[in-house]
Regions:
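Non-catalytic signal-transmission and effector/linker regions of two-component phosphorelay proteins
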Residues: 1-5, 15-18
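Conserved sequence signature across two-component system core domains
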Residues: 7-8, 37-39, 54
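Generic detector of well-ordered alpha-helical packing
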Residues: 9-10, 58
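Two-component/phosphorelay signaling modules centered on CheY-like receiver
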Residues: 11-35, 74
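Helix N-cap/capping motif at the beta->alpha junctions
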Residues: 36-42, 65
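CheY-like receiver
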Residues: 45, 51-114
């Protein structure tokens, strides 16, 4: 089972990503456990943050996804980080925190599947 966390302040975006992940799971026979968080603070307050993959929105109030990624990297070098953003100009900054890549919003199955 692959444990996936989604941190995004927009419910619609979280729902689109969950739909893409569900489709991936069904098409590949891969079991996924997906948890969602509506802001960085809720993620940081969670008791169980042992994820294999984290999808982070870059543009969130209070703490950006980039700031959250920096905090995550202080204690976890292994989790795969993927940024989901409509701010392409910031997406490349994700590589400074060891992000695997980024997905441009709105999330389309084609871009997710690649």
């Amino acid at each position: 089972m692959i444990r996936i966390g989604i941190v995004d302040d927009e419910k619609q975006e979280r729902d689109q990503l969950k739909q893409a992940l569900a489709r991936f799971s069904a098409e590949n026979g891969t079991e996924l456990n997906v948890q969602e968080f509506d802001c960085a603070a809720v993620y940081l307050a969670a008791q169980d943050r042992d994820f294999d993959i984290l999808y982070l929105d870059i543009d969130m109030p209070q703490m950006s996804g980039m700031e959250l990624a920096e905090k995550i990297r202080e204690t976890n070098q292994d989790v795969i980080l993927i940024f989901c953003t409509n701010l392409q100009q910031f997406a490349l900054n994700g590589y400074s925190v060891g992000a695997l890549g980024f997905i441009v919003k709105p999330i389309q199955w084609y871009s997710f599947h690649m």
